[in-house]
Amino acid sequence: MSFSVNYPNENFEWSGKNLNTIIFKNKNFFSIKFLKIIIGIIKFNFLAKINKQSFIKLKIDDFLKKFNFSKEFKKYYFYPMCSSIWSNPIDKIKNYKTYFLIKFFINHGLVNLLFRPQWKVIKLGSYKYIKKIIDLSDIKFFLNNTVKSIIINKDKIIIKNKNKLMNYDYLIFANHTDEIKKILPNNFKKQKKILSLVDYKTNDACLHTDTSLMPKNKYNWSSWNFISFNDNVSRLTYWMNYLQNLTCKRNYFVSINSNNLINKNKIIKKIKYSHPVFKHNKEYTLKKLEEIQGLNNIYYCGAWCGYGFHEDGVVSAKNVSNYLL
C-alpha cells in the first residue's frame, strides 16, 4: 500500500512507495520543504507511540499546533493522508479526535518508517466474500426491497417496505447511520441522538483510464494518489492495476471527487459512495452505542462502529452475534 502527494500548481510531488522514490527519484529530496516533512513524520510517529492520556480529548489540529508541527508536514503529508483514508475534506479531518487517528495509525502500522505490514487484497473484491456468505447460508435474501420504516408492536418488529409488512422477533441494522435514522420511529429519540455521533458524506467516484490525475513522474505512481489544487476538495486516485495486481496493459483508475477533471472519453463508470465522518473517539461511540443495543430487540452494526473499513464491519457484526447467542 503506497501513497503519493501531488500539488501541480506548486510543481511539488512525492511518493513514499520505496526508498527509490523517496530519495533517488525525488527531485525535492534536498529541499527544506521535504526535510520538514520527514522530520514531522518522525516526530509524529514518536509521539503516537507515547500515546499519552492527555491526547485523548484534543482535536488533531489542536494537537499539531500544540507540538509545533510544520505547515509542510501538515500540508504535504499528514492531512492528505488522513483525507485520503476517510475520503473527507481536510477541514473535517482537522476536527477528528487525536486519539482516534493515533489508534488507527498504530493499528495499521503507519507509525513505522520501516517494516510496514504488507497489505493483501481479495481476488474479485468484496463480491467474492459476499457470494461466499450467500452460498454457505440458508438465509433468505430480499434484494431491491427498500425498507421504508419499522413499527414496534409489543414484542414484535414489523418491517414495512414498498409492498408489504413483515413480522420479526429481532432486527439488526447493518447499514449507515443516516439511513437507520430515517427508518426508526420518531419516538426513538435516544437512538437517533446516539447514531448522530457518526455522520455520512457523499462522494463522487469514477472508474476511468485518464492518467492526468496521476503524478507527473511515473516513478511516483502509487496505490493511493492525492492531488490538490490548494482547495478544500479531497481528491484521490486509486491505481487499480497496482492495488489489485491487474495484469492488463491498460491502466485503470478510480478517482474520488474529480469527475470534472477527467477526460469524458476515458470515463467508464460513475458511482456515488457515502463515507463516514467521525466526530468522536471510537471507544466513546461504542460505549454510547451499548446503551441502545438490544432495546426493543433491535441491534446495530456496521463499519461506522470502528474506523469505517470492511474489517470494522466484520468485528461489529461479530459483536452483535455475541449479544444474540
Which ranges hold each PLM region?
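Mobile amphipathic helical/loop "lid" adjacent to a hydrophobic cofactor/ligand pocket
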Residues: M1-K103
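A structural signal for the hydrophobic beta-strands that form the central parallel beta-sheet
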Residues: F141-L143, F173, Y300
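A conserved FAD-binding loop/helix module that cradles the flavin
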Residues: C301-L325
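Mid-domain catalytic core of redox enzymes
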Residues: K148-V277
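FAD-binding beta-loop-beta segment adjacent to the flavin cofactor pocket
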Residues: L246-T247, L261-Y300, W304-Y307
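Short, well-ordered alpha-helix to beta-strand connector turns
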Residues: S137, Y168-D169, L295-N296
